[in-house]
Structures are given as structure tokens and as C-alpha cells.
Amino acid sequence: MNKLLIFLSVTFCLNAWSASLSEDEAISKLNEFFELLDLKVYEKDNIEKILTEDFKIFEMGKSWNMDEFDTFLQEASETTISTDWDLSEYRVSLDDNSAHISYVNNGTFVNTDGEVIYSYWLESVYMVKEQGVLKLKFLQSDLVNREVR
């Protein structure tokens, strides 16, 4: 009987340990999203691999699914030479199958006419595990300040 209890305890602990998320895993997935958004490497098929099918992004007062967001990105890429995001001040909340992160995003965009746009956002992302893989389900972006030079 004691051996059975020990076996069940160890099995339960191993299952709980292997199923949980870490802050590093969640932050890494968020950073991967922004790396895949870089205009130099952006491909819709690649970014969709880390998104749920019902992914939504709320930005600039609009709600977009990935198809709509892709259209926006394609149009923006016609006048944008480079994109860069600096994420910081992560606040992470986790459970076994989901993660929520709020963070600061400082973005720099260089346009074809030489303008440099500096944007400061407060953002939030919700991620869920699907078949053991962490994916982005929802992203909220609130522009705090924008400066054009």
C-alpha cells in the first residue's frame, strides 16, 4: 500500500510539473510573435503557427482576426522600411494551461520617405496551450504616445 501511495504521489507530481508553464516560456512566445512580425521575415503562414485559430488583436480602435491584420500589415509594408519593437516591464500571470502578460512596447518604424516613428504602447496578451503548445489567443494594444521625426 505504501508503495502504491508513493507511486501515485510521484506520478501526480511529475504530471503537474510537466504540464505547467513558466514565465520564461510565456515571455519567449511573446517575443517570438514580434520577431515574426518583423517586415524582413514576415510571412502569414509562419506567424499563424503560434496563434490560435480564433486569434484576435485589438489595436488602433479596431478588432482584427489574423486575415484582417495581415491585410493591414501588407498595406503598411508598402511604406515601411523597417520595424523594431523593444518589450519591457513584463507582468506575468500563469496557470497550467494559460498565460497573461502585460508589458510596455516601444516601437520604432522607418518609412520610405525617411520619417522615423516612435510609438509607446501599453499592451496585454493572453496565451493558451493547445495540444501542449503555447499559442497567442488575444492581444490588446493601447497607444500611449507617438512621435514622428
Where are the regions that the model predicts?
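Positively charged n-region of N-terminal signal peptides that target proteins for export
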Residues: 1-4
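Short, low-complexity N-terminal intrinsically disordered segments enriched in polar/charged residues
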Residues: 9, 14-50
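A solvent-exposed, acidic/Ser-Thr-rich amphipathic alpha-helical stretch
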Residues: 44, 48-94
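Hydrophobic/aromatic beta-strand elements that line small-molecule binding cavities or substrate pockets
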Residues: 73, 87-92, 105-107, 122-128
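Short, cysteine-centered beta-strand-loop-beta hairpins and adjacent loop/turn segments enriched
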Residues: 78-80, 107-118
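A short hydrophobic beta-strand element
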Residues: 83, 97-107
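A short, structured loop/turn motif at beta-sheet edges
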Residues: 92-100, 127-134
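Short beta-strand edge/turn micro-motifs at domain boundaries
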Residues: 120-149
